[in-house]
Regions:
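Glycine-rich flexible loops
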Residues: 1-190
Length: 190
């Protein structure tokens, strides 16, 4: 794949992001969380761009050339490569939370089964887990952490709107599941 970068983005910065994505994708593939060409990963490059996995590539076999640049509207920048159909879910996070630097979407068996089991209620509620305190905004294992389970759709604007509605209702969001699909989560680094 040929990737031409805007003059404002140093090649070394893009390469660092691409290498971090490749490394994370391989580790998650080794765990069995990214079967074949499923899943997608991205990292913020600057205020207007992100590096993201190209569509249709086996995540355990990625190389630097399998990472492309997009703008935060989800458009390819400087390449004819095609990003994931779910790119809008990544860019939504970067636009909403400028401090977020990475988005991970995986398809582990556990996530997929949990999404099916809890889809009817629309949410998984976690309480009593000591590790909850490691999540921003949660100071006690007695707090209730909700992870929404959104209905699956191939119409990304609909899914983006569901995520927005959750947030506009004032609910905290650190991850979400898509029914029968997988999880999206994000953070300040890969």
């Amino acid at each position: 794949m040929i990737q031409t970068l805007p003059a404002t983005i140093p090649a070394s910065l893009f390469e660092q992001r691409a290498d971090a994505i490749v490394e994370a994708a391989r580790e998650l593939s080794d765990l069995g969380w990214t079967p074949a060409t499923s899943s997608n990963f991205s990292m913020r490059v600057d205020d207007a761009h992100a590096a993201i996995t190209v569509s249709g590539k086996h995540k355990g076999r990625l190389g630097r050339d399998d990472i492309m640049l997009i703008d935060l509207a989800g458009n390819a920048v400087g390449t004819d490569a095609r990003p994931s159909a779910e790119t809008a879910l990544h860019t939504q996070i970067y636009r909403r939370w400028p401090a977020m630097q990475a988005v991970l979407h995986t398809h582990s068996r556990t996530q997929s089964v949990a999404s099916r089991l809890y889809a009817g209620g629309g949410v998984i509620r976690l309480q009593g887990w000591e590790l909850q305190k490691a999540i921003s905004g949660y100071h006690s294992h007695d707090s209730v952490l909700e992870i929404p389970v959104f209905p699956n759709t191939q119409h990304m604007p609909e899914l983006v709107a569901r995520v927005d509605a959750w947030l506009e209702a004032g609910k905290p969001l650190h991850a979400y599941l898509i029914d029968g699909h997988g999880i999206y989560t994000w953070g300040r680094d890969m």
